[in-house]
């Protein structure tokens, strides 16, 4: 029910409609459901690797992983709030920093250390220092989110320090990436 052939769906509405399927025009791929399918043990290695490949193909940017793509452009009350957020901001197609480390850890669970490092390096504030004119935030702070591809300010970081990213990054790095 949750596997869609290349990735795990986001969820199911109260009316039974699947969210995050290949057939969806908006909100087709979601990062969190795929990372947690691996971390929870629901995904077998074959599906887990396909899910991570889909994350990389559809959600990876030079600034980190977007939460979903393509972003929602039409409000849909059956899905909820995310469909009312401007495309490319916050929960709707932005690089929301807090859950990015879940994908790093998931890659490590599957033995994909190189992929975990690629994801890590993209979000790491220090590694974005040469893009400061775009990022416009401190090079030592994770930010709540980085504006996603669908927005004209793609790559601009927002709300420094207002995030749980540092704790999750530390956990993913020390408990998964370093062994």
What does each of the following model-derived ranges do?
Residues 1-179:
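Acidic, mature catalytic/reactive cores of soluble proteins
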């Amino acid at each position: 029910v949750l596997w869609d052939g290349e990735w795990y769906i986001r969820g199911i509405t109260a009316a039974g409609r699947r969210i995050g399927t290949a057939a969806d025009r908006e909100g087709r791929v979601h990062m969190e459901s795929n990372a947690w399918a691996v971390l929870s043990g629901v995904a077998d290695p074959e599906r887990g690797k396909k899910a991570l490949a889909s994350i990389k193909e559809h959600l990876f940017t030079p600034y980190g992983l977007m939460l979903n793509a393509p972003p929602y452009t039409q409000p849909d009350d059956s899905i909820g709030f995310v469909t009312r957020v401007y495309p490319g901001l916050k929960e709707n197609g932005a690089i929301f920093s807090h859950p990015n480390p879940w994908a790093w850890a998931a890659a490590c669970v599957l033995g994909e250390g190189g992929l975990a490092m690629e994801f890590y390096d993209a979000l790491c504030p220090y590694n974005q220092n040469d893009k400061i004119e775009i990022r416009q935030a401190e090079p030592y702070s994770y930010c709540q989110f980085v504006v996603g591809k669908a927005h004209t300010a793609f790559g601009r970081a927002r709300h420094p320090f207002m995030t749980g990213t540092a704790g999750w990054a530390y956990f993913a790095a020390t408990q998964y990436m370093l062994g």
